[in-house]
Amino acid sequence: MQHIDYLNLKDINSPLQQDILDAIHQVVESGWYLQGKANQQFAEAYAQYIGTQYCIPCGNGLDALKLMLRGEMELGRLHEGDEIIVPANTYIATILAITECRLKPILVEPRWETLQIDDRLLHQVLTPLSLIHI
């Protein structure tokens, strides 16, 4: 039986290898692994690319989700106890971000065909406290 690589990152990254190594070298040489020049340049370029004024680089998805939810709370759009609808097959970071912000995750089973929330089930979970779907 022939082996087929799931995601051959070596082949994918091969054309960019020297650029990647150069970028890593520049960051290591600068001594700024967090909040350095490369981070600032990325944030500015990404904000421009997606058409927004600001970009906040995060170390992981959990931190990004918490910042988003806390921002919505600071703006008064979310309040402790509000419900956030998520697919039951979501990654644990989604649930952790919601609960750390004292919000309530509402898990909805996904459709087998798409692995996305089964919209036919939403009427069973929607309440006046259901405000966001992640």
Positions of PLM-derived features:
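PLP-dependent aminotransferase-like
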Residues: 73-132
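Pocket-edge positions in alpha/beta enzyme catalytic cores
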Residues: 12, 31-34, 107-109, 114
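Small/polar loops that bind or transfer phosphate-bearing groups
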Residues: 8, 57, 86
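Phosphate-binding glycine-rich loop
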Residues: 32, 37-83, 97-101, 107
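N-terminal "arm"/small-domain region of PLP-dependent enzymes with the aminotransferase-like
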Residues: 1-32
